[in-house]
Amino acid sequence: MGMLRSRGWRLVGSVALAATLAAAGCANDTDTASTPTTAASTGDDRSTTTAEATTTAPERSCDQEPTMSPVEAAPVAATPSDVDVTSFDGTTIRLHWFPAPGDDRHPTVLMGPGWSQPGSTLAQDPILFGALGIAGMNEAGYNVLTWDPRGFGESTGLASVNDPEREGRDVQVLLDWVAEQRVAVVDRPGDPRVGMVGASYGGGIQLTVAAIDCRVDALVPSLAWHSLRTSLHKSETVKAGWAGFLNTAAVTFGGRLDPHISSAAESGVGQGILSDEDREWFISRGPGDLIDQVSVPTLFVQGTVDTLFTLDEAVVNYESLRSRNVPTAMIWFCGGHGTCLTDEGDATLVNERSFAWLDKYLKGNDSADTGDRVDVVDQNAKHWTAADYPVELADPVTAEGAGELTLDATSAAGPLAAPRSGANDILSGSVLAITPSKAATALEVKIDPGKVDALALGAPRLEMSYSGTTPAGDRPTRVFAQLVDDDTGIVLGNQITPIDIVLDGTQRDVSVDLEMIAFHLQPGHTVTLQLVATTVAYAQPRLGGSLDASKISISLPVANDVTPG
């Protein structure tokens, strides 16, 4: 097998930081296996040996046939691990093949990279997003396949944001190719025993592929999304910070993009809006409604401080699978597309649970301990577990207030001045400019938990009666809501929520769920709701004029059936 290697795109300085925002084929520092050193089949030896030769598969039914047979594949000269395969439409997809040591047959794990990146070829990737590393998976008895998605790395074509009809079908061809490998376990001819891991772009593709191809047997998507409408364009408000960041990363590293991507980034940053065509294009990208077609065991891993793909994206996906009795679990950790400003806690948990998930659902080891179905971490690195989500709720912690907010640039949330001392998440330095922070000028409501000593878990609810005026303009009218820990001055989860308002002088009411939180409420420790006029996280709204809130009500959900760790 070809040596795991560093690639030329791993640079230093600000350019490298731009690349790291979505890199996903990553090793946790618990992966300590040595670099594999032997080559294996690249397609000439085809296997029809069934899975029972090596392990027992979980019961399932799948009649998906190969989409291409045989797969047109060509080894890359001087790089034994690399193979170019021809996809359904003639696009060349570069794959990287790292079989487990020895000649036995093993299940295979496909590990997708992050946005703008080629497939990982590193034994231990430095980007600690909680995904599994190649060396660790090889040592655990898995073949590993990574690949350059279309539009990135050495693959041809245009990046289309995990379009089921493009990137989804590309991965189907990779499944076809794996089924032809001599060292791959197959459940029947053309149907390899396959799991998928990866974060961000490499998390989203898992859900898309599993929805269209039943040959996938287990998933561990980290930092994935449900809908690009709710994640990138919440309340019809563009996440301009991330839009610019993602577009810059792709262009910097030579990505070849569908024109809708650059168009949306330019209009989102420049005007604060998307064209109808661009909005519909992003909505059509997976998984969205395709999540209801995913029926394989799935472990969702999401970050409490992820400001790109927030917690609710994982929750919607999780609830779809749970409603259909598909084996699923969910872990929230302090990380993701963002920076953890509090204690990160157990750095090995995600890695251990991910391996256990693959062990149980890919190898068929029923004794593997996959942990609690729901495991979340609070601001003190304390873990809380639950039998399911949503959890049963106790009486909420509530507060009310009123006041006026002048809508000008002095009322702004962010940028963040500095990362937490000693922070080791790779994005700490590169996302400061687009991360919300406590505002110096805001309309505030103090929230006192009283005697409550419990976990606030889920989406706080904000209700407001208001009126106001603002000058005419093309930009949308918005205010933004965030919660601040008064002990530390840190915005809970670094999360801020846009609120669509109408400022025409008429008295109006608005109700909105804020971004989800996991925060330990304790007596004597207050939280403050801040309403601000603008934020670095979203496109600047129309400024000028003021908002007069005659009543603001905020409600924090309090979990009743969670167990502290």
Regions found by a protein language model. Give the residues of each.
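Accessory cap/linker subdomain of secreted extracellular hydrolases
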Residues: 58-72, 121, 127-131, 139, ...
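Short, low-complexity, disordered segments immediately C-terminal to signal peptides
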Residues: 27-56
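Short substrate-entry loop that stabilizes the transition state in hydrolases
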Residues: 103-106, 111-141, 145, 150-156, ...
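C-terminal, loop-rich substrate-recognition/catalytic regions characterized by aromatic stacking residues
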Residues: 344-565
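C-terminal motif of bacterial Sec signal peptides marking the signal peptidase cleavage site
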Residues: 22-25
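Short beta-strand/loop motif that positions the catalytic acidic residue
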Residues: 294, 300-302, 306
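Gly/Ser-rich "nucleophile elbow"/oxyanion-hole loop immediately N-terminal to the catalytic nucleophile
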Residues: 102-103, 158-166, 173-200
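N-terminal cap/lid segment of alpha/beta-hydrolase-fold proteins
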Residues: 63-104
